[in-house]
Protein backbone atom coordinates (compact mmCIF):
# COMPACT_ATOMS: atom_id res chain seq x y z
CA UNK A 1 0.00 0.00 0.00
CA UNK A 2 1.27 3.48 -0.90
CA UNK A 3 2.08 6.13 1.65
CA UNK A 4 2.86 9.83 1.44
CA UNK A 5 3.46 12.30 4.30
CA UNK A 6 2.77 16.02 3.85
CA UNK A 7 4.48 18.58 6.12
CA UNK A 8 3.46 22.21 6.55
CA UNK A 9 7.03 23.45 6.95
CA UNK A 10 10.27 22.86 5.08
CA UNK A 11 12.64 20.03 6.01
CA UNK A 12 9.82 17.82 7.33
CA UNK A 13 8.89 20.13 10.18
CA UNK A 14 5.58 21.35 11.54
CA UNK A 15 2.17 19.76 11.39
CA UNK A 16 2.01 16.71 9.14
CA UNK A 17 -0.56 14.40 7.57
CA UNK A 18 -0.08 10.78 6.45
CA UNK A 19 -2.09 9.63 3.46
CA UNK A 20 -2.43 6.15 1.93
CA UNK A 21 -5.19 6.64 -0.66
CA UNK A 22 -6.66 9.18 -3.06
CA UNK A 23 -7.90 12.37 -1.41
CA UNK A 24 -10.00 14.94 -3.30
CA UNK A 25 -9.59 17.63 -0.62
CA UNK A 26 -6.56 17.87 1.65
CA UNK A 27 -7.41 21.31 3.09
CA UNK A 28 -8.88 19.92 6.37
CA UNK A 29 -5.50 18.33 7.18
CA UNK A 30 -3.00 21.16 6.51
CA UNK A 31 -3.01 24.76 5.31
CA UNK A 32 0.22 24.70 3.29
CA UNK A 33 2.71 22.07 2.11
CA UNK A 34 6.43 22.82 2.12
CA UNK A 35 7.93 19.32 2.30
CA UNK A 36 6.91 15.76 1.46
CA UNK A 37 8.09 12.23 2.11
CA UNK A 38 6.90 9.60 -0.36
CA UNK A 39 7.41 6.27 1.38
CA UNK A 40 6.09 4.07 -1.42
CA UNK A 41 4.55 4.10 -4.89
CA UNK A 42 3.98 7.01 -7.26
CA UNK A 43 1.67 9.93 -6.46
CA UNK A 44 0.10 12.76 -8.43
CA UNK A 45 -0.38 15.96 -6.42
CA UNK A 46 -2.73 18.73 -7.51
CA UNK A 47 -2.66 22.41 -6.66
CA UNK A 48 -6.45 22.58 -6.23
CA UNK A 49 -9.15 20.32 -4.73
CA UNK A 50 -10.86 17.67 -6.87
CA UNK A 51 -7.70 16.88 -8.84
CA UNK A 52 -7.50 20.26 -10.58
CA UNK A 53 -4.76 22.81 -11.22
CA UNK A 54 -1.03 22.26 -11.56
CA UNK A 55 0.03 18.62 -11.31
CA UNK A 56 3.18 17.18 -9.75
CA UNK A 57 4.17 13.54 -10.15
CA UNK A 58 6.35 12.20 -7.32
CA UNK A 59 8.06 8.88 -6.73
CA UNK A 60 9.56 7.41 -3.58
CA UNK A 61 11.91 9.85 -1.92
CA UNK A 62 12.27 12.97 0.19
CA UNK A 63 11.34 16.46 -0.96
CA UNK A 64 12.51 18.97 1.71
CA UNK A 65 10.92 21.97 -0.03
CA UNK A 66 8.39 22.50 -2.82
CA UNK A 67 11.05 23.46 -5.38
CA UNK A 68 12.35 19.88 -5.18
CA UNK A 69 9.11 18.59 -6.74
CA UNK A 70 9.11 21.52 -9.22
CA UNK A 71 6.30 23.20 -7.30
CA UNK A 72 5.35 26.79 -8.05
CA UNK A 73 4.12 27.41 -4.49
CA UNK A 74 3.25 25.64 -1.23
CA UNK A 75 -0.29 24.77 -2.32
CA UNK A 76 -1.24 21.07 -2.50
CA UNK A 77 -4.99 20.42 -2.22
CA UNK A 78 -5.59 16.90 -3.58
CA UNK A 79 -3.63 13.74 -4.41
CA UNK A 80 -3.93 10.41 -6.19
CA UNK A 81 -1.92 7.25 -5.75
CA UNK A 82 -0.96 5.63 -9.03
CA UNK A 83 -1.83 1.97 -9.34
CA UNK A 84 0.85 -0.44 -10.48
CA UNK A 85 0.99 -0.86 -14.23
CA UNK A 86 2.20 -3.59 -16.50
CA UNK A 87 5.35 -3.32 -18.51
CA UNK A 88 3.68 -2.15 -21.72
CA UNK A 89 3.73 1.53 -22.76
CA UNK A 90 2.14 2.93 -25.91
CA UNK A 91 0.75 6.30 -26.89
CA UNK A 92 -0.21 8.10 -30.10
CA UNK A 93 0.31 11.85 -30.33
CA UNK A 94 -1.31 14.10 -32.93
CA UNK A 95 -0.44 17.53 -34.26
CA UNK A 96 -4.10 18.60 -34.52
CA UNK A 97 -7.22 18.53 -32.35
CA UNK A 98 -9.42 15.43 -32.26
CA UNK A 99 -6.69 13.09 -33.55
CA UNK A 100 -6.09 15.05 -36.75
CA UNK A 101 -2.93 15.72 -38.71
CA UNK A 102 0.29 13.80 -38.43
CA UNK A 103 0.28 10.93 -35.92
CA UNK A 104 3.34 9.51 -34.16
CA UNK A 105 3.36 6.41 -31.97
CA UNK A 106 5.58 6.43 -28.88
CA UNK A 107 6.65 3.55 -26.67
CA UNK A 108 9.62 5.09 -24.83
CA UNK A 109 10.75 8.29 -23.10
CA UNK A 110 11.36 11.40 -25.18
CA UNK A 111 13.59 14.16 -23.68
CA UNK A 112 12.81 16.54 -26.57
CA UNK A 113 9.60 16.34 -28.57
CA UNK A 114 10.94 18.90 -31.05
CA UNK A 115 14.22 17.08 -31.70
CA UNK A 116 12.41 13.82 -32.30
CA UNK A 117 9.30 14.89 -34.23
CA UNK A 118 10.09 18.44 -35.43
CA UNK A 119 7.07 20.01 -33.79
CA UNK A 120 6.46 21.39 -30.30
CA UNK A 121 2.68 21.19 -30.07
CA UNK A 122 0.64 18.12 -29.27
CA UNK A 123 -3.04 18.94 -29.69
CA UNK A 124 -4.50 15.50 -28.94
CA UNK A 125 -3.36 12.02 -27.95
CA UNK A 126 -4.47 8.48 -27.23
CA UNK A 127 -2.80 6.63 -24.36
CA UNK A 128 -3.22 2.93 -25.05
CA UNK A 129 -0.94 1.43 -22.38
CA UNK A 130 0.83 2.64 -19.26
CA UNK A 131 0.98 5.93 -17.40
CA UNK A 132 2.92 8.88 -18.79
CA UNK A 133 3.96 12.42 -17.85
CA UNK A 134 3.96 15.32 -20.31
CA UNK A 135 6.36 18.15 -19.41
CA UNK A 136 6.05 21.72 -20.60
CA UNK A 137 9.77 21.99 -21.48
CA UNK A 138 12.49 19.67 -22.86
CA UNK A 139 14.53 17.49 -20.51
CA UNK A 140 11.58 16.82 -18.19
CA UNK A 141 11.20 20.36 -16.84
CA UNK A 142 8.29 22.72 -16.26
CA UNK A 143 4.63 21.97 -15.66
CA UNK A 144 3.71 18.31 -15.52
CA UNK A 145 0.61 16.58 -16.85
CA UNK A 146 -0.30 13.09 -15.74
CA UNK A 147 -1.59 10.93 -18.60
CA UNK A 148 -3.55 7.75 -17.90
CA UNK A 149 -4.95 5.38 -20.56
CA UNK A 150 -7.70 7.08 -22.53
CA UNK A 151 -8.44 9.61 -25.24
CA UNK A 152 -7.53 13.29 -24.97
CA UNK A 153 -9.20 15.19 -27.83
CA UNK A 154 -7.58 18.52 -26.93
CA UNK A 155 -4.80 19.68 -24.61
CA UNK A 156 -7.30 21.06 -22.09
CA UNK A 157 -8.52 17.45 -21.55
CA UNK A 158 -5.23 16.68 -19.77
CA UNK A 159 -5.25 20.00 -17.91
CA UNK A 160 -2.91 21.82 -20.27
CA UNK A 161 -3.00 25.59 -20.67
CA UNK A 162 -1.42 25.32 -24.12
CA UNK A 163 -0.57 22.58 -26.60
CA UNK A 164 3.19 22.90 -26.02
CA UNK A 165 4.83 19.69 -24.81
CA UNK A 166 8.62 19.77 -24.51
CA UNK A 167 9.24 16.21 -23.31
CA UNK A 168 7.42 13.11 -22.10
CA UNK A 169 8.28 10.03 -20.10
CA UNK A 170 6.79 6.78 -18.91
CA UNK A 171 5.98 6.26 -15.25
CA UNK A 172 7.90 3.11 -14.49
CA UNK A 173 7.88 1.14 -11.25
UniProtKB/Swiss-Prot annotation:
Function, as annotated: Crystallins are the dominant structural components of the vertebrate eye lens.
Biological process annotations from GO: lens development in camera-type eye; visual perception
Entry keyword annotation includes Repeat: yes
Coiled-coil parts of chain: none
Record's comment describing the protein's domains: Has a two-domain beta-structure, folded into four very similar Greek key motifs.
Name this polypeptide is given: Gamma-crystallin S-1
Gene3D superfamilies noted in UniProt: Crystallins
Amino acid sequence: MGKIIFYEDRNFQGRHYECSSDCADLSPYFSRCNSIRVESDWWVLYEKPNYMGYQYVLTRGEYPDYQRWMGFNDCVRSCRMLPHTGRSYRMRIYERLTFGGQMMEIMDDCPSVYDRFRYRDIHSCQVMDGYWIFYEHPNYRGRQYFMRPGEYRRYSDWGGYSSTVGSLRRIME
